[in-house]
Amino acid sequence: YDRLTGYFRARALTLAARGIEGLVRNNGRMRLLVGCTLNPPEVEAIAKGAECRAQVTAHLLANPLKPGNQREVEALELLAWMVANQILEVQVAVPCDEHRRPMPAQGIFHEKAGIIEDKTGDRLAFNGSLNETEAGWTQNWESLNIFRSWLGDDPRVAAEETNFAKLWSGESRHVITMPVPDALRDDLLRFL
């Protein structure tokens, strides 16, 4: 599952728990490219997960993230577990100028699209207004365009895949992308 989103909240993962269970069972992977809008507990969970792949559970218990309620605790634990077990890779996207310098307060990466491939090779792509947040999935009025490879939409699916690959690999001229721990080291998250 490849996903581009302007906003991400860990609680969105709990809404997709059944799908994530299937992803894990089938050795699937998720790549999430999110605008630099992560809140501090989520950045911390991702960073902790990336730094302690061998001992996630013990590390989380020893270093609580201070979320506001039990649902947030569970969402952040799931996020860190997915990162630590290499099921989820997260990168941040920061708009940049023509010299590839981040542009503070000049807009955000706000693209919203996704590509899902099943074990038979069928692919579904979507784009629209939906962010990867609990409110986006359950409360907001959103629009979504869906393209299915098995129904003749293969060119549209391929276009979404190409766009994702270009952004994920850092080949876009006006967006810098990098894994969250790198962003912490490079101080890019000050542009949140």
Where are these regions (language model features)?
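PLD/PLD-like phosphodiesterase catalytic module centered on the HKD motif
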Residues: 2-192
